[in-house]
């Protein structure tokens, strides 16, 4: 068992992209499924499915590549860690690459992008950023 399951998920995605794999399997949780949903909505992955294999649930994340086989996700990194949580208010949500990337936050109303949290006047914990 890992001490930071979100970082484990992001590392698996990063490694699969570098190896040019079409999909990657990660152990499932509700929070990871919400992160995958946001990545799909923002166009960073093709699709994801929560699959039950026996007693264990896994999330199959189908990665997205451009026409020249370059990955759509240039970088994906963890911001708030178990040892150093990062919380921001609505006015303090940072921009990623001048608006070209996204922050994924967990707020009192659920997991959403930094842009959506700002529109709804919400702050929260920055889970990761993607560009």
Swiss-Prot record:
Keywords: Ribonucleoprotein, Ribosomal protein, RNA-binding, rRNA-binding. GO terms for cellular component: ribonucleoprotein complex; ribosome. GO terms for biological process: translation. The keyword Electron transport does not apply. The keyword Oxidoreductase does not apply. SUPFAM superfamilies: Ribosomal protein S8 (SSF56047). Pfam families: Ribosomal_S8. GO terms for molecular function: rRNA binding; structural constituent of ribosome. One of the primary rRNA binding proteins, it binds directly to 16S rRNA central domain where it helps coordinate assembly of the platform of the 30S subunit. Part of the 30S ribosomal subunit. Contacts proteins S5 and S12. Belongs to the universal ribosomal protein uS8 family. PANTHER family: 40S RIBOSOMAL PROTEIN S15A. HAMAP family: Ribosomal_uS8_B (MF_01302_B). NCBIfam families: PRK00136.1. This is Small ribosomal subunit protein uS8. It comes from Solibacter usitatus (strain Ellin6076). The gene is rpsH.
